[in-house]
Amino acid sequence: MELCRSLALLGGSLGLMFCLIALSTDFWFEAVGPTHSAHSGLWPTGHGDIISGYIHVTQTFSIMAVLWALVSVSFLVLSCFPSLFPPGHGPLVSTTAAFAAAISMVVAMAVYTSERWDQPPHPQIQTFFSWSFYLGWVSAILLLCTGALSLGAHCGGPRPGYETL
């Protein structure tokens, strides 16, 4: 149980950190032309620009993923201290929150990927996904692993019973 909880805490912390970095950086998409290159993220800087709906969806679900991941990691930390939290409930709440974070991040990444993938290419400009985009996908995988490990910690943990009264 301790190994599962420790690994879940490590995976959740990394997933939360990667999710925050992906959300806050602007290297999701890169375009390289004959003389210039440009990159963009989820937070366009041009004033008065019309922001596409898929960007708003990606922003919303990414923020939800960060919040769920924060809840998951918080309950994992609290479950390490039995005097602060009743035994058995921390990993279960963490499992639910981690899976919710993973699903939110997968939705955000799938929407962004499908919309960018369908954009018509320009013959003189090479476009590709950049490192912030890939960090978002890695965070989704880490959050999914956190949910599975938290579930393992919950199932392998002590059950509250008559002896705890």
Curated annotation (Swiss-Prot):
It comes from the Eukaryota. The chain crosses the membrane at residues 9-29, 61-81, 92-112, 133-153. GO terms for biological process: CD4-positive, alpha-beta T cell activation; defense response to protozoan; granzyme-mediated programmed cell death signaling pathway; inflammatory response; killing of cells of another organism; natural killer cell degranulation; natural killer cell mediated cytotoxicity; natural killer cell mediated cytotoxicity directed against tumor cell target. GO terms for cellular component: cytolytic granule; cytolytic granule membrane; plasma membrane. Expressed in activated T-cells, in kidney, liver, lung and pancreas. Not expressed in brain, heart, or skeletal muscle. Expressed at high levels in TCR gamma delta-expressing CTL clones, and in some TCR alpha beta-expressing CTL clones (both CD4+ and CD8+), but is not expressed in other TCR alpha beta-expressing CTL clones and in cell lines representing B-cells, monocytes, and myeloid cells. It is found in: Cell membrane; Cytolytic granule membrane. It is a multi-pass membrane protein. Pfam families: PMP22_Claudin. PROSITE patterns: PMP22_1. InterPro entries: PMP-22/EMP/MP20-like, PMP22/EMP/MP20/Claudin, PMP22_EMP_MP20. Regulates cytotoxic granule exocytosis in effector lymphocytes, thus acting as a critical mediator of inflammation in a broad range of infectious and non-infectious diseases. Essential for cytotoxic degranulation of natural killer (NK) cells and CD8(+) T-cells and for the activation of CD4(+) T-cells following infection. Plays a critical role in CD8(+) T-cell and NK cell-mediated cytolysis of target cells and contributes to the cytolytic activity via the perforin/granzyme pathway by enhancing exocytosis of LAMP1-carrying lytic granules. Belongs to the PMP-22/EMP/MP20 family. This is Protein NKG7. It comes from Homo sapiens.
